Regions:
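Short, flexible helix-loop junctions that flank or precede catalytic/ligand sites
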Residues: 1-167
């Protein structure tokens, strides 16, 4: 059985255990003081999957990267408008003298980034539009080299890897 741990603020949906998974949900302010405190505790529980409701600060982002580097599947949310900008947002949280190391860590631990938005549709409702960047060797090299515009071009050309842009 997979152990899934969520850290949320607030918990928006209560998940039930299944025969394949055990799900523990932690709510910031109710069960823990912060995302980073909950994430540090989560690493001691050895979950298979960690969902972080929002990666807001340096400590949470550092711990998320550490969790990914140690074999956990980490899913987290950031408020950004594209996959390329998500990488920049992660790296920019680090002090300038640590950003090169952060790019290296992200380039080796990242599986992919999905950026999503809701757009008005022709029926008056809203539809999901998304961008997907998969961390291929080329994307990893561009992350390490800090080549943002080239990463976007690689996403445009990466449909054989499942990548797509918002356009």
């Amino acid at each position: 059985r997979r152990h899934i741990l969520t850290i949320e603020d607030p918990i928006e949906f209560i998940f039930q255990h299944t025969e394949n998974s055990i799900i523990h949900q932690r709510e910031v302010k109710r069960d823990t003081n912060s995302f980073s405190v909950a994430l540090r505790a989560a690493l001691r529980e050895d979950p298979d999957v960690i969902y972080i409701g929002e990666m807001r600060d340096l400590e949470t982002i550092q711990l998320a990267i550490t969790a990914a580097e140690t074999g956990h599947l980490v899913l987290g949310t950031l408020h950004t408008s594209s996959a390329a900008k998500t990488v920049e947002r992660i790296v920019d949280v680090f002090p300038a003298d640590q950003q090169e190391q952060a790019r290296l860590q992200v380039s080796t631990s990242l599986a992919g980034i999905m950026s999503q938005t809701l757009c008005k549709n022709t029926k008056g409702g809203r539809s999901l539009a998304y961008e997907l960047m998969v961390n291929t060797p080329a994307i990893g090299n561009l992350i390490r080299a800090n080549k943002v515009s080239e990463r976007y071009s690689q996403v445009q050309l990466g449909s054989q890897h499942g990548m797509s842009t918002l356009e």
